[in-house]
């Protein structure tokens, strides 16, 4: 397959060109065009590396916590329509049995593949979080951080776990963080009431990422910088839900200036109502009302989002002064780095997986390719 005459978005520039895809890989950039090849005309379109969502609970009426392969597969198909080619199905603070069941389904999807976006691994959001920063998690199922409880949750599927969100200030967290690092799992700081010094201690133990910046964490104050201050004061990565609801765009711009775009990932934190009409849904077993693009619990707390990554890219591009290639890095390369797959995903480079998105000047997705296969065309 050849995609010809498109605007190729590299990590540092955008250039007109063509690419050859063979055996699921980017074989050559600017190849000789053979008339016998299957050709996609990319004229007036942009070719981007596929988006990578490291924090997503559901889409299209399906939830990771459904605990079955079918739901993971359906989510993968829905988000592929919006340019996502890899993702981390994200669990909630539910019972150990329910999380274990979901991890098993994620491990199955990782091993056997899906019909849409690739499953790289699981992101466990909880259950080792603070009851004081519960957000839309269920306080009944919070667990004290412990290596034994973590092992009970993942069972034989530790290799399927990519990241875990936890609160570093809670007793037992430091030992668990060290264990996670030793097992090549990314510990992320989130749903945490930590003070600045406690957050810094967690970072020293091995925390290298932070979950949905500004949301469900202690805010910045000039005398107590909190978790936000610790994120800004160190080189750990962070992620933003860039829907204009979770974070004001002025706050987004400030965060990007402080961290630099190489340290920020765009995520959706989407729940099952993503790509569905407004109405009543659930998230991790809790009732959610979706109205005017916002998902909330009955008490008013935000409950994930209905954001897609193409919309996140569009929002950031339209509300900042960053060039398109930098914004795309936030939605692709940075996620690949967190997932430790940046040697084969996250950029357009010869030898890399042909996980690609073609979109127009308004960032409307026209084609999505996963491993060189067209999984969506408008």
Enumerate the predicted regions with their spans.
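N-terminal metal-binding scaffold of metallo-dependent hydrolase/deaminase domains
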Residues: 1-34, 369, 374
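C-terminal cap of metal-dependent C-N hydrolases
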Residues: 6, 337, 348-378
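Alpha-helical scaffold segments that flank or form the walls of functional sites
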Residues: 46, 54, 64-117, 141-156, ...
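Divalent metal-dependent hydrolysis catalytic cores, especially in the metallo-beta-lactamase
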Residues: 57, 73-102, 117-130, 157-169, ...
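Active-site gating loops and adjacent loop-to-helix segments of metal-dependent hydrolytic enzymes
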Residues: 77-88, 130-158, 200-213, 227-237, ...
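Active-site core of metal-dependent hydrolases
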Residues: 155-276
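His/Asp/Glu-enriched, well-ordered alpha-helical/loop segment
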Residues: 227-240, 256-268, 274-358
């Amino acid at each position: 397959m050849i995609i010809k005459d498109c605007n190729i978005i590299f990590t540092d520039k955008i250039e007109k060109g063509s690419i050859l895809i063979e055996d699921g890989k980017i074989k050559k950039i600017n190849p000789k065009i053979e008339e016998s090849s299957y050709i996609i005309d990319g004229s007036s379109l942009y070719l981007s590396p596929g988006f990578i969502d490291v924090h997503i609970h559901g889409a299209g009426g399906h939830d990771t916590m459904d605990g079955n392969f079918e739901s993971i597969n359906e989510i993968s198909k829905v988000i592929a329509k919006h340019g996502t080619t890899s993702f981390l199905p994200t669990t909630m603070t539910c019972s150990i049995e329910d999380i274990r069941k979901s991890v098993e389904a994620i491990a199955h999807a990782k091993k056997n593949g899906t019909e849409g976006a690739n499953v790289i691994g699981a992101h466990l959001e909880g259950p080792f979080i603070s009851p004081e920063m519960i957000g839309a998690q269920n306080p009944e199922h919070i667990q004290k951080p412990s290596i034994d409880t973590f092992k009970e949750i993942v069972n034989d599927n530790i290799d399927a776990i990519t990241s875990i969100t936890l609160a570093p200030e809670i007793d037992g967290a430091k030992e668990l963080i060290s264990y996670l690092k030793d097992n090549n799992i990314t510990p992320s700081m989130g749903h945490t009431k930590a003070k600045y010094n406690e957050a810094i201690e967690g970072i020293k133990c091995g925390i290298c990422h932070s979950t949905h910046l500004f949301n469900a964490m202690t805010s910045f104050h000039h005398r107590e910088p909190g978790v936000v201050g610790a994120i800004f004061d160190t080189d750990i990565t962070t992620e933003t839900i860039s829907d204009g609801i979770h974070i004001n765009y002025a706050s987004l711009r400030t965060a990007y200036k402080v961290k630099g775009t190489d340290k920020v990932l765009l995520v959706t934190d989407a729940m099952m109502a993503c790509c569905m009409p407004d109405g009543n849904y659930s998230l991790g077993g809790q009732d959610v009302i979706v109205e005017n693009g916002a998902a909330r619990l009955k008490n008013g707390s935000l409950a994930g989002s209905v954001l897609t990554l193409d919309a996140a890219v569009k929002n950031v591009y339209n509300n900042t002064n960053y060039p398109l290639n930098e914004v795309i890095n936030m939605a692709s390369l940075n996620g690949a780095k967190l997932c430790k797959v940046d040697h084969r995903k996250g950029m357009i480079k010869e030898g890399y997986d042909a996980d690609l998105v073609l979109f127009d000047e308004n960032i409307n997705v026209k084609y999505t390719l996963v491993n060189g296969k067209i999984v969506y065309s408008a």
